[in-house]
Amino acid sequence: LLGFVATFGTAGAWGWMRYSPEHYASAQAFLIGFIAIFIAASILYARATPLRLGWGVSHAVDHTLVFGTPLLGFGLQAGLVQPFWHGAAFSALGFGATYLLLAAALLRRAADGYRLLVECFLALGVGFVTLAVPLALDAQWTSAIWALEGAAAFWVGTRQARWMPRAFGLVLQLLACLSFFGTLGQPVSAWPLAHPGFVGAVLIALPALAIAHWARRPLPHSGSRWALGYARLEALLPTPLFLYGFILWLQAWSLESVRLLPAPVVDQPMTAAWSSTAAQWLMTSATLLSAAAALQWALRTRWAAAAWPSRLGLPVLVLALIAQWGVGHHVTDGFAWPAWPLALALHGWLLHRNEHAGADLLNPGWARWLDWQHTGTAWLLMALVGDALTAGVDHARLWGTAWASVIGVASATAVLAGLTRWAGRANRASARGRFAWPLNTHAEAYYWRAVAPLALLLWLGAFALAWTSSGRTEPLPYIPLLNPTDLAVLLAMGALLLWRGMVNAAEPRPQGAGLLRQPVFWGAIGLLALVVLSTVWLRVAHHFFQVPWNAWALYHSFVVQTGYAILWTVLALALMVAAHRRGLRPAWLAGAGLLALVVLKLILVDLSNRGGGERIIAFIGVGVLMLVVGYLAPLPPRAAARIDKEAA
């Protein structure tokens, strides 16, 4: 030890104060000889010093000689080769090769008790080879090499039932991750998939996935206290490692999607290798196909974590649609129109395979999530149809005409009626077994959860269409109740009633469907019907009496106001007569409320308008109709009173 310290101290002091490049040859020879002497000394010391360990008798190791020689020697060597290209990297590689060869030579004599020294030399050899990588390559390639080396070390530890190589492999994975993300930037390359960003990310992702695959089941170890502690940590790693590797795999494709092409001329800006649409679909396709491959892996190995990415197909497609909207594109633009059906088909396949994967891969929480994905998929399809219709209206330049709103309401009506007809066939649980997937297990997700928000939107859309549309749908002439505006609104009301009847007939009835039997539903339908019939008269006044289509002109029009008074009274009369004959007291009261509204309008609106003759006509017409109502439709008795009367 005294010679070791003295030699190092003298060599270091001389190198610091007196060394110059012309001394390289003699200094290099001295350093090689010095290292060889003390390596031999460490081997001779181990040979001469037996030591009893847990696995038997081995030779002791002088840690100062074994570890001090290469560490201090490499420090001096790095100073000697500093002027040379990659001198430190080649020196580290030489140190690593030397110690690996020594370990291999001593391994044949492990039966003689050199096992401890072999492990020390192996650790030094692997360490120097690992160190050579960052000294020679940039950070992205360094991280890739470290990740591969870490996977190799983990595999060796798995085969040898030793925890230390496995721990070393995990540490290298962590270092690779830090090195890669610490220098991450937008790649510049003329070659697709052949640049450090993509290749580096792939070479980090694949080792992480391999380690996750090996560690998914408990691995053997020596049983020592340290090994048991490491085993508890290792048992927590497979799922996070898999997710980390899968995300890195997607990161590789993300780096490819943002790749820049080198500028053809100096000082000119670089251009994107992929258009925005192409980059979006590259990422979407890579994500869905990778998820499908992971699902196949999960089905083959029965590893539940590998199936997780395949259950996120719907969020991926939603993000793709949002990204498409963000750049102002539609589903009908470019190659998006064939890509969307393929992506939806793959998403459907993923749903089907997941739901039939077995209880060991699909727990109840994931099952509920997949059930809601059916609802979300229906909403996504509605959004895609709406986007395509928007593109069509834009292409036909129909904005500003009634056609735009008519197309929207008619399309929503068709979707609601289609889902009612298709999914409503399986509205009885007892009969679902004869239907194919997905109706046999998810019919309610389509005919109730998916359609209920659409029904509300359709009601609002029909209300807005009836309220705002002038009915001008050139080149078609305006015919009351037979024009596109009125027909679209009436069909919407019919579809809502059809859907309500199907839901009410369901067994068991969906949760929350009781609202469709409450007065609030009929109140909403009645309000929509009143608005529809009232605005029909507005459009008649506009088209046949030349009343301008604006709020001021319509409000101050004698034709509109008198027509409203008579129309609402007739509607109230019809409602009250029908309610009287059927004994529907709430409906009769609704008609009476409408009559009260007519009277209020006569007082507040008609009396304030000019023209005594106009007011007289309105009052006489309404008064006569009220007399008819009082004669033909008196208030029905309450339900209890009617029952007592019938019993008597």
Q: Model regions: which residues?
A:
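Hydrophobic alpha-helical membrane segments
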Residues: 456-458, 590-601
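Short histidine
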Residues: 586
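Cytoplasmic C-terminal tails of single-pass
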Residues: 644-648
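Hydrophobic alpha-helical transmembrane segments
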Residues: 567-572
